[in-house]
């Protein structure tokens, strides 16, 4: 059996801050796609960097997108998922660009120079706890 718990907005932000890779959901024309992306948080925005001229960079411009993160802890059989939905826009604010530039980045993505922020308007999350089923000995013996 699985117990399900809805998470409040504050806990969703806390969980977002614990991971560095998420899944970006957006449209390429009429086709929806899910793309794994590294990200960081800055001023209640999700910030991603992409390569100038890349298809994902074009699709991110002034779109409404979804961003999802999750994690699973084997030791306590707990999983969680957070989904944020909001508009994406190029980062042009010098303060934000400087802050993002100083953040640690994955070496594989250092050459990406297009910075986009997603400003979540909706954020929700769930925690799932897998409970070990208990088997009644009376039921086992009655077969």
Feature map (PLM): residue ranges:
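Short, structured beta-strand-loop surface elements
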Residues: 52-114, 120-122
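Short, basic/aromatic recognition patches
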Residues: 1-23
């Amino acid at each position: 059996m699985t117990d399900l718990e809805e998470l409040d907005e504050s806990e969703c932000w806390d969980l977002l801050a614990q991971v560095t890779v998420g899944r970006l959901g957006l449209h390429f024309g009429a086709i929806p796609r899910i793309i794994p992306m590294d990200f960081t948080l800055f001023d209640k925005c999700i910030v991603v960097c992409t390569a100038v001229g890349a298809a994902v960079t074009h699709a991110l411009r002034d779109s409404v997108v979804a961003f999802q993160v999750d994690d699973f802890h084997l030791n306590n059989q707990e999983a969680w998922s957070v989904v944020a939905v909001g508009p994406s826009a190029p980062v042009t604010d010098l303060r934000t660009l400087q802050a993002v530039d100083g953040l640690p980045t994955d070496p594989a993505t250092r050459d990406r120079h297009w910075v986009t922020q997603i400003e979540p308007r909706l954020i929700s999350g769930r925690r799932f706890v897998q409970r070990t089923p208990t088997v009644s000995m009376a039921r086992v013996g009655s077969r």
